[in-house]
Amino acid sequence: MGQPVVHFEIMGRDAARLQSFYADLFTWTINADNPMKYGMVDRAANLTADGIGIGGGIGALPEDMPGGHVTVYVAVPDVEAALAKAASLGATRLMGPEKVTDGVEIGIFNDPEGHLIGLIKSAA
């Protein structure tokens, strides 16, 4: 058995903007009430009915660090609707929806700071 993904981190220049973007897009519960304003994505508050989901963090890059991107795939009930909502919040659609295998559809976008984010819907 492989090791599961248990955390993700999305870092950018404007942490508050990114935290707001993801809270609005996916209705994530994010708590940045700490000295670093690091937004902890609450795993327990974001689980599916089957207990599926991971927690993570959204924060600001130190000034001396170059930018980058993180790719995570987020399960959504409707890839097209999620891509459209992401675009309405300032994202750039890159791909999709696209069927990759039977019952699996994906989409990819760049968030407002250029992070590559994937969306996935599976028939499981």
For each feature predicted by the language model, list its residue ranges.
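Core segments of cupin and vicinal oxygen chelate
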Residues: 2, 9-53
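Vicinal oxygen chelate
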Residues: 5-13, 33, 61-85, 89-124
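Conserved active-site tyrosine of GNAT-family acetyltransferases
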Residues: 18-22, 86, 114
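Short polar/acidic secondary-structure junctions
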Residues: 46, 63-64, 98-99
